[in-house]
Each structure stands twice: as structure tokens, then as C-alpha cells.
């Protein structure tokens, strides 16, 4: 919010309300956060959701996207500009999280279509290659670290300014090679702590 005030798309009159709660599912976002955002009647709402839904086995990705679109429609019909964020690429994530890649990719395809249909700005986290270094992630390897949040905030501002992604191409940082025994032990510890 501080960066937005001094940016070409911001103003001194900017007021900021963070309604986000980590771990929410799309249903909860629609039922709790979107109505509150509508009450505030802002000029802009940023909405990122669905990642936790994608992690749940059996979730109908198409249905989640349809619900997300309902929220976007409600915001746009109220005259609110919408900044949407898509899911990150799990290609270099832990072996368990890596398995979500097809689900996240399908969900992201829906999000891009929603953004186009309703004239929304897209924060492309999938394409933000600088996001994939280990320092960008919290110990749970699901949520961003402070450095990751800063990078995403910078990119959100760039998206609002219609600037290109800061790095292009498909290269992602390599994961360090670890002995299989070490990798299995680390993954088992991660599962116990974070799943």
C-alpha cells in the first residue's frame, strides 16, 4: 500500500484494508471477505484465492473457478477494479506439492479467462521466475517469506502499471542436489510439520 501511494497509479488519498486471511478456501473468501470488500466500496480490490482448494484431493477445480468468477462479477458490477493473482508454478516445489502442478495450471487457465472476460488486471505469479528461489518461501514451503511477499507486492504494483514481468523465460532456479536419504528425511519432517 505504501508503494502504491507514490506510484503513477496511486494517490495521496489511498486507504488500505487487508481482509485476507491465510488458509481460506474460495467459499470462505466469497462468503466472508467479498461482502466486506463491497461494503467498503473501494476503487480497487486485489483477490488471490484457490490455492488451498487446489491442494485438497477431490476438489472440483472448474467449480472453484466458477465460484471465484461470481466474486469477480460482484466486484466489477459494483464498479470496483480488480487485481487478480494466479497460482505459482509448483514444478520446483517439494515432491508432494509438485503433484499439484496440473491442478494449479487448470485453475490458472480459468483465472486468465475470468480476468479477460471482466477486464481485470492479472498478477502473474506463475510467470514470476524470481519467485522460485528458496529464500522466497516460508518454512512450510507453501506460503511466502517476507522477501517473497515483497517481490509479489512489487509485481502487483507493476501489473497495475501494466509493466512487464521483471524476468522472462522459463528458467527456474535449480533445486540443490541432495542425497536421497537426506531428501526423504527432509520431506518426512516437512509432512509432519506442515500437512
Feature locations, PLM:
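Serine-esterase "nucleophile elbow" of acetyl-processing enzymes
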Residues: 1-22, 32-41, 45
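Cell-envelope and extracellular/periplasmic
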Residues: 20-24, 49-54
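Glycine-rich anion/phosphate-binding loops
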Residues: 21-31, 58-70
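Surface-exposed cleft-lining segments at the edges of enzyme active sites
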Residues: 52-62, 95-99
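Alpha-helical scaffolding segments of alpha/beta enzyme cores, especially the outer helices
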Residues: 63-77, 102, 106-113
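A short helix->loop->beta-strand "cap" motif at the edges of active sites that frequently abuts
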Residues: 77-82, 120
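Substrate-gating cap/lid alpha-helix
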Residues: 92-126, 146
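Conserved catalytic region of serine esterases and O-acyltransferases that act on ester linkages
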Residues: 113, 117, 140-195
